[in-house]
Structures are given as structure tokens and as C-alpha cells.
Amino acid sequence: MTRGKTTPGSGTARAGTTCRGRVSFVGSGPGDPGLLTVRAAELLHEADVVVTEVPEHADLVRAVCGATEAGPELVDGGFGEDGQPLTHAARSKVVVRQAKRGLRVVRLMAGDPFLYASGPEEAQACVKAGIAFEIVPGVSSVSAVPAYAGIPLTTKDHREVAVVTCGDKVDWAQYADRRTLVLLSAVGQIGDIAAALVAAGRAPETPVAMTRVGTTTEQATVTSTLERIAVDARAARMAPPAVTVVGDVVGLRDALSWFETKPLFGWRVLVPRTKEQAGTLSQRLRGYGAVPDEVPTISVEPPRNPQQMDKAVRGLVEGRYEWIAFTSVNAVKAVREKFEEYGLDARAFSGLKIAAVGDKTAQAIAQWGLRADLVPSGEQSAAGLLEDWPEYDELLDPINRVFLPRADIATENLVAGLVDLGWECDDVTAYRTVRAAPPPAPTRDAIKTGKFDAVVFTSSSTVRNLVGIAGKPHPSTVIAVIGPATAKTAEEHGLRVDVMSPKPDVEVLVDALADFGAARRLAMVEAGQPVTRPSDRKPSARRKAGTSR
């Protein structure tokens, strides 16, 4: 974040806006970016400036607005130019100063803007300065964190709830009844609070749950009683931010815990693909509670000799081909870029049959306004495509030539199979796959020292390239592969394969990893052991290569 420093594309009122500034006090919610409200996202898109004291909000703004130079300026509301922490009054001056520049200011605040005193104080400063403002509530941690911990605040038998911001002047005697209590800022004084509640008449065995960094993949919950919560919280090293629930509703957590029990909860999973390629895979991993870390191992580059591709595209337009076969999304992208270079569009495919390997490739074709005539009914591979490919028939097929835009490292199996079926093939290098640059040093260190819980390999080349640019994953890391060929390559590099997808599909691969994680978790629970992640345990000896499926 900047400290009064303007980033490119921001810092001045956008074209088409008036010069009257406005402040939107926006709650970011309790931590999960998915809980950001629709109105909050709209305002972030429209903002000229975002003022926040929360470092993690920079990632949130980038996720909502995209990593573009035209995005809003981020102004540090936590520290001044002298490096000293800002008071509420000083932060209010920062907000007002930005609005007086005629900018649309989003004051992005953790949780809900009016849950704590800072929001109202800064809004009052806007009133005094004559600055228009609005309040956009965030999903409150009061309700969200217990919900993510599997604890309802009310039931048919417990309908009263009290929310208490803990401090030195709380009269705990007024909370001696059986109503549910939600305690904020209680971590440091939970022992004194519990003792005061017991002294006021609460039963020592009253259930208590304390949840730290709720709604995030670092969430952790300790369940205890008023009598033991101080000891148990200390043993679990609980620290702020945390929300504490006191009352019988805590007893429902065993049955209703849904977030922390996800099969890959908190797992840091290495995804050796580009962000563009990893979208679906990473999204599915997040659904199972994992934290994907995308590390490109392959860089896609244009062919060294573009003449071959130019000639093939001209031949396509002139009607030299009966079929075009796309074996990857990258192949679709390469042909589409060449079309745009020549000023062509999808009409050039008129009369041409289109084949695609894999649903994602077919979807990429569909985004072009085209529909694949042939997608393998079985295995999504060159072999699967050959099984369904028709033999050349002189009566039915006026042209016997196939255009294959592929990578420079593609195998000859598809070409040989098509020739056996009577077709002639133009096997054209549409793009090159080259080894990507090594990841940053912290990532390489995490790979080698076992800080990743799992790595997901989607091809043999990702295995070879990851080992080449970053080193071999630590023996404690779970290795998941998309199929037998990738498993063989992993084993050749001294890795033990723990999970293999039953079919060559990235979503099925993630499901298989989740099944592995669920079985691992269940085994720990049944053995009475604490549930840990693979990175929490380091074996004393390196694992030997060999497949466990």
C-alpha cells in the first residue's frame, strides 16, 4: 500500500465523474473473500482510492478489480508517512483529505464498519467536513465466525443472544442466565471472564468455543468449558482475532461442523500450471478447503518458424482440409490468435469438421462460437480420439486431409493413427512449450522442505519441469497425478505417487485427492489422534519410490 503516493491510472477523478468527493465505508466481512457483498464489490470497481489499514485487503482489491494499472489507488490507513501508527482522528483526516480531492473513496474496514468505534468516528469527520458518505455493512464476525465453526447462535430452546465487547468495565453478573454469549476481544482475559461468569452463577461445565481467524483456511476452534477454557486456550495457543461463544449451543458443533472438516481443509497445494490453465483446478481445490498455490512450470511461446502455421491457416481458408483437430486449449488459442492476425473470424470454419480432445478444449472452441463435431466418448487423449475417428471414405469425404495444430513436443501417435485410417495429416507446430523461469526462492524452499501438503501433477511435463526449475518435492508431500503416464514419470524422478485420478480429468483428479484427504482424516479421528496436515509431520526417512493407490 502507498502512503499518500499515487499509483499509475489512479489518484485523479475518473473521466465522466463530478469533482465532488464521496466516501463509502465498506465492510470487508470476517475474512473469507467470498463473503464480500455485491454492493461492496461494485464500489471497489468504481473507486478512485481505497483507504485501509489491513494489509490483506490489497489482495482482496486485486481479486475484485483485477491486477490492472487502472485500478484504485491503495492508501495505507494504518501508518503515517513517519511510520507511526495512525490514531482514529489521524485516519479520519486521511479519508477526508482524499475525498476533498474530488475522488470516490472506499474506506475498506475489516468486518462491519459500525461494529467498532472507528467507523462512526470517521463518518462524523465526514459530516463535519461536508463530505457525503454511505455505509455498506459487512457480514459480521459475530454471526459468521460461529456459523463457520458449526455453532448456531439460537435454537428453539435457546433464543436469546448477547454480544459483549470485552473490557475492564463489563458487569458479568448481568450475564449469569443461560442465554448465549458472543464475546469479542476476549482472548487475553478469557480466564478472568470465565471465573467472573462462574462467580455470577453460570455452571462451570457450561460449554465454550473459541475460534480464531474465523472463515479463513487458518481457522481453528477450541471447545471447552468455563472451568477449563483458560487452560485449553493457552494450550492451543489461541490468539486474536478470535470470537468466543458461551452457552449450550456450542454442543451442536460436533454435529454441525462443516468448514474445518472439509477433506483438504487448510492444505497448501502446489499447482504447477499457469493461472490461466489452473482456474478450474484451483477453484475445485478451494471448494474442498485447500489453499492452491499456482506455480507455472511451462511457458507457451509462438513457434520459431511461423511460416508453417501461416501456410496451414491459408489452406484452411482455401478449403484444403476436411478436419481440424484441437488437442489442447493452447492449440485453440494459437489458431485463434493467427485468425485475429489475418482479420479472420469463425466463418472461415464453414464446411470444416472440428474435433476436440477434452471438455475444456471443446469449451474453448464453443467460446469462439463453434461446436466440436467429435469429442472422444472415452479417454480424453489422442488414443481416445483415434478410437472414435472415422476411416477415410472416398465417397463420403471429398477431402482426405487433416489439420493438426499442436505443440512442438507432441508425440507422433495421433498422426500415425490417422494415416492408418487413410487420412493425410498436416502436423503443424502451433506453439512451443518451454520450461518456465524458476519460482521465487521462498516457493522453492517450501517445495523442498515440505511446507506444501500436496502437489497436483496434470502431465508428465509438469513433473519434469517442476523438478527441473524448483527441485524435488519433500517426501512428506502428497503426490497426486492425472494418469498412469504421469505416475510413471513421477516415479522415474524418485517420487512416490499417493493419488492417481481414475480418468484424465483435472476435476476428477482433485476429487481423488479430496477422497484421499477424507480417508486420512477419518483414520486419525478413529485412532484418537489430532487431525494434522501432511506438512505438520516430517518422516525421519525419505520415502522410497513406489505407487500407493
Give a label for each model feature.
Residues 1-136, 176, 242, 319-334, ...:
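Class I S-adenosyl-L-methionine
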Residues 2-19, 139, 151, 279-286, ...:
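Short, charged N-terminal beta->alpha structural module
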Residues 57-58, 69, 135-146, 159-172, ...:
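Conserved beta-alpha
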Residues 170-210:
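Conserved anion/nucleotide-ligand pocket segment
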